[in-house]
Regions:
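N-terminal "arm"/small-domain region of PLP-dependent enzymes with the aminotransferase-like
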Residues: 1-42
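Helix C-cap/helix->beta junction micro-motif
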Residues: 8, 119, 179-180
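Walker B catalytic acidic pair
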Residues: 188
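Metal-dependent active-site segment of extracytoplasmic phospho-/sulfohydrolases and closely related
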Residues: 181-183, 194
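Conserved core of the PLP fold type I
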Residues: 39-175, 192-204
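A conserved amphipathic alpha-helix that caps or lines the catalytic cleft of carbohydrate-
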Residues: 2-5, 177, 203
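Residue-level marker for buried hydrophobic side chains located in beta-strands
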Residues: 10, 184-185
């Protein structure tokens, strides 16, 4: 439809969330050091050094006790893999005779919907609107939905709006999850994109 359109200014591509800048030189050098090892399979759960580094980073970033690399961490090929597999593994079918519900913010990352469908759950979309500061108000859902909820998925900072959940919002989600017995999947893949104040995370 836009094939014959000639924009007056440089266009910005918002279609896919991928880096638009070249790979930094120091990253290229670091990868080059290990190029001879790229023909091997890595450890399934991640190397000990990697998991220890992640544990240390989480402790410093969120000011928490260091998570156990053996019990609390697993290396993933991006958040998509983790969200999808965790949904399949942890979607609870024991809450009643009806299909379990997975709550999904709208707009949403396509992986959320794919995971819900693969788990044979009912996806329920909860709007992120200007009126709720682009953070879905899950508490307004009817009890009949919340009682069937197995997993709530939330993205903060959100995409595409950039809304950031504060401590009060996280606490309200935790209270709701405890009341209705569901799990929270917190997708914080944009947590390190900010100007001045670090976004608060669920681990805090």
């Amino acid at each position: 439809l836009l094939g014959k359109v000639n924009p007056l200014e440089e266009t910005l591509d918002f279609s896919v969330g991928e880096p638009k800048h070249p790979v930094p030189p120091f990253v290229k050098k670091e990868i080059a050091k290990y190029v001879d090892q790229l023909n091997r399979y890595p450890p399934n759960f991640g190397s000990e050094k990697l998991l220890e580094s992640i544990s240390s980073w989480l402790a410093n970033r969120y000011e928490i006790n260091s998570p156990s690399p053996d019990k609390n961490l697993v290396a993933l090929n991006g958040s998509r893999e983790g969200i999808f597999n965790a949904t399949i593994a942890l979607c609870n079918y024991k809450k009643g005779s009806e299909k379990p519900v997975i709550l999904i913010p709208n707009p949403f990352y396509q992986c959320y919907l794919a995971a819900a469908l693969a788990a044979d759950a009912e996806p329920v979309f909860v709007p992120a609107l200007p009126s709720n500061h682009f953070l879905p108000d899950f508490s307004k859902l009817p009890p009949k939905i919340l009682n069937r909820t197995s997993i709530l998925i939330i993205c903060s900072p959100s995409n595409p709006q950039g809304a950031v959940a504060d401590l009060n919002y996280w606490q309200s989600l935790l209270n709701l999850a405890e009341l209705y017995g569901f799990k929270i999947f917190s997708d914080e893949c944009y947590s390190e994109i900010y100007r001045d104040v670090k976004p608060v995370g669920l681990l805090q």
